[in-house]
Amino acid sequence: MKIYYAAPLFNDMELKRNSEMKKWLESKGYQVYLPQDESGLSYEMMNENNKLEINRKIFEGDVECIKNSDLLIFDLNGRVPDEGGCVEVGMAYAWGIKAIGFKTDTRALDYTGDDNLMIGGCLNFKIAKNLEELEKMLKEI
């Protein structure tokens, strides 16, 4: 199964966590597309002369990988979900690609203690709270 791992990737902690999740998923036999590894990090590649070109290349590469995935996992950790991840999970939903969430962070977005219902809907309201739940959800797909 090919998995697209959508997650924030803007600081050392996030990059490390994403890499750890990729290794964990690969140890379970999944093929994982992790944007920070495959497309690169835009802030490391661009300068004033190539910003638009680099952004377009990364966007188009990530979109193509979402389309070719069997499943998208959206890492919802953080005070609010990553904006890029929100777009990615919306694309997956629109294209009929299954998606599940992963969130160990107890902070939530709205007054009910839940994340935004539009994000939840794209995930079929399947959000794993730990690795054991995530593994169980993966086996059910």
Locations of the language-model features?
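Conserved catalytic or regulatory cores that recognize and/or transform ribose-phosphate-containing ligands
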Residues: 1-141
